[in-house]
Amino acid sequence: MYNFKDSVSITVISGNGGSGCVSFLREKFNAKGGPDGGNGGSGGSVIFKVKENLRTLSSYKNGHVLCAKNGRPGMSFKRSGANGKDLILFVPPNTDIYNENDEALLCRLEKLNDEFVILKGGRGGLGNWNFKTSIRRAPRFAQPGESGNSLNVRLELFLVADIGLVGPPNAGKSSLLNRITSAKSRVANYPFTTKIPHLGVLRYSYDDLIIADIPGIIKGASFGVGLGTKFLKHITKTKILALVIDISEANFLESYNILLNELKSYSYKLFNKKKIIIANKLDLDSSEKNFNCLIKALGKEEKIIGISIYENRGIDELIKEFFILAKAF
């Protein structure tokens, strides 16, 4: 499949260490006890970790600042302050982490439970009891906590689409991608608006799918005709092919057959993939009649869903079907 790069830049900050405590023991029978100020807690570290079933970087937004917790100050009776909680940032497998300032690759997290401590928290300061000596019996100072560090990082992830939107030019693939995801594919009323694959992430009920909009496939694409040629090979790794056709056209059935023939001519592996047929533009004249003809022609063996992006018809049903098909793998 065509490798789509998901990239996001964020700032991470480790926690400050807590300050050491200045304290002296004061008890009923020991009014002038010695120093007993405890140490400050360490600041939280920032850790990137690979999480199972995480597919994208969609939980992060460009410009976000994410901070670990600060360590707590030391206390009397030589009690240490609590350590700051680590900030654990979950990422999908095969995520690269770069230093945004110098473009250096800091780490590559490839498999489940891989982790990388990108910033350590500041050390806690020493309490005043640590500074007592035979000469300095009552130190009235303690050590401040060490400051945390900050770093601008860029996360990069190469994605493989779950579902490829395939169809002739102007069938409405880009409009569909834009409707069901946050992608911004170019849309216009002329052929070959999409000149490169576009990617979108479809989120539904705490899960997500990666959807790709492939440039329009025309007759002869498998032999080098049109813009879809070099992208046919890139959809061989998708789980599902979503065949999008303009059901308002008089030659809708011919368009569908051309699409199937091009897939078959390119490779049987591609042709034999699980498919769903999307009959788009149900809001236009003759569409309902054509839709019924399509169902009759293809029979019950093919999964066919009629939609209208303009009227938002069938979109919810289509989204649910995408997830049902994807989870069947």
Swiss-Prot record:
Keywords for the protein's UniProt record, in alphabetical order: Cytoplasm, GTP-binding, Hydrolase, Magnesium, Metal-binding, Nucleotide-binding
Family annotation (Pfam families): GTP1_OBG (PF01018), MMR_HSR1 (PF01926)
Residue span, Obg domain: 2-160
EC number: 3.6.5.-
Cofactor: Mg(2+)
Keyword Transmembrane: no
Family: Belongs to the TRAFAC class OBG-HflX-like GTPase superfamily. OBG GTPase family.
Lineage top rank: taxon: Bacteria
Enzyme type, top EC level: hydrolase
Species of the source: Borrelia garinii subsp. bavariensis (strain ATCC BAA-2496 / DSM 23469 / PBi)
Main location, first listed in the record: cytoplasm
Protein name: GTPase Obg
Described function: An essential GTPase which binds GTP, GDP and possibly (p)ppGpp with moderate affinity, with high nucleotide exchange rates and a fairly low GTP hydrolysis rate. Plays a role in control of the cell cycle, stress response, ribosome biogenesis and in those bacteria that undergo differentiation, in morphogenesis control.
Subcellular location: Cytoplasm
Any one GO molecular-function label of the UniProt entry: magnesium ion binding
Ranges for domain OBG-type G: 161-327
Gene: obg
